[in-house]
Amino acid sequence: MSLQQTIEQAFENRNEYSPATMPQDVRDAINQVLEQLDNGTLRVAEKKDGEWVVNQWAKKAVLLSFRLNDNYVQAAGEHVQFYDKVPTKFANWTEAQFKEAGVRVVPPAVARKGSYIAPGAVLMPSYVNIGAYVDQGAMVDTWATVGSCAQIGKNVHLSGGVGIGGVLEPLQANPTIIEDNCFIGARSEIVEGVIVEEGAVISMGVYIGQSTRIYDRETGEIHRGRVPAGSVVVPGSLPSEDGTHSLYAAIIVKKVDAQTRAKTSVNELLRLA
């Protein structure tokens, strides 16, 4: 039976499993998937022929992993302890391992085992959950959170306090995806499997879930679940049909190409909106 088949079958029987009753072959399969997610050789979602494909079986392995262990005390220095069932990624790393990985981890940043942090990525005091993928050159700024199985592209900047939603709680079908070269402004939230396409700029305080209307003021189009590539997005509202009230919406105020994006600072793009 293949690794995928073992996980798929185990997921169907997941309610029968606990740390005490987990079969050894299932335990080994889950740990193998977690190790592959941790070193980046497996991803919960990947782009193939221009479309994002979700490896649902890998996500199922992440969900099953919470049945592997009971909570246990995890020491983090002389005065700090955690009590959880998932180990942290860097708990036993040596200086040589950090240098080889090429990542910078600023205290008290935490990444869970089973997340991948690519070379050149920087974790300011932040949190990266299990199954997440943080690609090369990404900056996860102070108090930003990268949810379980979320996919963060190359050179993405997640500003202070940004929340990128996960798949575990509440259970989601697909991970949230931030493609390459995107900027997510401070305190913004992107959740529920929304895809922010390449080069988009999200202003401070923008909240986008699957039901959020994303209004393009140049074309009048309304998008849901997807921010088109190169969009510059700010918070706003749209009026009701009867004109009695307005409801929150994300507003695409302009589109920029890669050349413009390279020559123009994020602040300038937003000021000129």
From Swiss-Prot:
InterPro entries: DapD_Trfase_Hexpep_rpt_fam (IPR005664), Hexapep (IPR001451), Hexapep_transf_CS (IPR018357), THP_succinylTrfase_dom1 (IPR023180), THP_succinylTrfase_N_sf (IPR037133), Trimer_LpxA-like_sf (IPR011004). Pathway: Amino-acid biosynthesis; L-lysine biosynthesis via DAP pathway; LL-2,6-diaminopimelate from (S)-tetrahydrodipicolinate (succinylase route): step 1/3. It catalyses: (S)-2,3,4,5-tetrahydrodipicolinate + succinyl-CoA + H2O = (S)-2-succinylamino-6-oxoheptanedioate + CoA. Its main location: cytoplasm. It is found in: Cytoplasm. One of its GO terms (cellular component) is cytoplasm. HAMAP family: DapD. It comes from the Bacteria. Gene3D superfamilies: Hexapeptide repeat proteins (2.160.10.10), Tetrahydrodipicolinate-N-succinyltransferase, N-terminal domain (1.10.166.10). Keywords: Acyltransferase, Amino-acid biosynthesis, Cytoplasm, Diaminopimelate biosynthesis, Lysine biosynthesis, Repeat, Transferase. Its EC number is 2.3.1.117. This is 2,3,4,5-tetrahydropyridine-2,6-dicarboxylate N-succinyltransferase. It is an enzyme of class 2 (transferase). Substrate binds at R104, D141. Pfam families: Hexapep_2, THDPS_N_2. The lineage of its organism: Bacteria, Pseudomonadati, Pseudomonadota, Gammaproteobacteria, Moraxellales. GO terms for molecular function: 2,3,4,5-tetrahydropyridine-2,6-dicarboxylate N-succinyltransferase activity; nucleotidyltransferase activity. NCBIfam families: dapD, PRK11830.1. Belongs to the transferase hexapeptide repeat family. GO terms for biological process: diaminopimelate biosynthetic process; lysine biosynthetic process via diaminopimelate. Homotrimer. It comes from Psychrobacter cryohalolentis (strain ATCC BAA-1226 / DSM 17306 / VKM B-2378 / K5).
